[in-house]
Structures are given as structure tokens and as C-alpha cells.
């Protein structure tokens, strides 16, 4: 087995046998990695606490046939210790971790931009400077954009004619003009659409100045769009407080 080192974020863990744990990581260079942490559930484990969701780690692994093996790990940032103390931030973070795994999906396919987005999102959540819903929605929109599913917000998703347009259709890919609008389209407020644009662009000044009703409407649109475009959806979004 070859030895390699990477930087990663723990997305999910699963107990294996009596003492081991399977860890799913999104790493900077390798992409999505599943590895076994041997003996990490034992009380005297050298690095059990470092292999928990939300933890940003420096990790050394042996490449295996089906699962890699963690041989060394150091904590770079323990975001979970902050997020678990605040329910809105915690649930937003859980949704981000699940989304990252769903968006990347293919193991060991480098996904640097997705890694950087997740790292930045967790760091911003932990800092607590913005509404957790805004941080989550900004992450979801950008992650989808990197994956090739960016919603059309300033032009018609079907014909490309410049907006502004009045209707939004998740199954069509975003805003649609009056000629292209399919059945099931909704009419979001211009302010909610403007907030989506601000979050996608990283315009935090505009996002932070948004009204509560617009944040709630924006969150609903983003959640619906994400669930439509990701296979099997993101279950943890149900836990996020949207109002």
C-alpha cells in the first residue's frame, strides 16, 4: 500500500466492528476519501477525537483496495466544538457536510473548489458574523454552481433572454421569461431573487441588510432548487430553521 498525506474535512463517520470507525473526508488534493480509523473508538486512542464531523485535519493514510487506512492525524481546526453549542449553526453545518458529499459523490476525484467552499463555509459559520441561514444558502448556491448547476437568476433559464423575469422554476433551472415559463413556476419577490444573486456573488453587505421575510423566501427557493438537482436530496435540510 502506498502512503500519502492530505488536508481534509471530516464529513461523516460510521462505526465498524468494536473499535474501528469508517471516516468520510473531503480532501484538498484527493477529493472524497473513505478510510478506516483503527481503534479510534477506544478510550486510549491517539486520534479518535480528531476524526469527528466538522474537523479540519492534516491526515496521513495508506491507500487500500476498498478503504484507505488512517495512520496519523492532526487537528487544524475543530469547528464542531463551536457549532454544537448553537442549534441554528449546527444544523446549517450538518446540511453543508451532507451536501458536500452528495455534490462530489465520486471518490478520489480531485475537487479543490468544493473543498475550499466547504472550508470557508464552516469557518464563516464558526465565526458567527452572519445569519446561519445566509451562510448555508450562500454555500449551497456556490457549491451547486461549481458542480455545474448554477441557477439562472438574471436571464431566462430556457432561452437566455436577459431579465429581470418574474417567475422561478426549479425544474427549468431558475428564473424564466413569460414565454418559457413551465407549469409549476412560482413568483418570488424581486427582493428574494436579489438576495440569491447577492449570496451567489458573495455580496455580504447586501445579504446582511436583507429583510427577514426575504431571507425566509430565499431559503425556501434554494432548498427546493437543491433538492431537485441532487439525486435523493439532502435529508438534513429538514432540520434547518427556515423562519
From Swiss-Prot:
One cellular component term from this protein's GO annotations in UniProt: bacterial nucleoid
Keywords on record: DNA damage, DNA recombination, DNA repair
Biological process terms in GO annotation: DNA recombination; double-strand break repair
DNA damage is among the record's keywords: yes
Gene3D superfamilies (UniProt xref): Nucleic acid-binding proteins (2.40.50.140), Recombination protein O, C-terminal domain (1.20.1440.120), Recombination protein O, zinc-binding domain (6.20.220.20)
Entry's family note: Belongs to the RecO family.
Alphabetical list of PANTHER family matching this protein: DNA REPAIR PROTEIN RECO
Cross-referenced NCBIfam families: reco (TIGR00613)
Function as written in the Swiss-Prot or TrEMBL entry: Involved in DNA repair and RecF pathway recombination.
Protein's recorded name: DNA repair protein RecO
Gene that produces this protein: recO
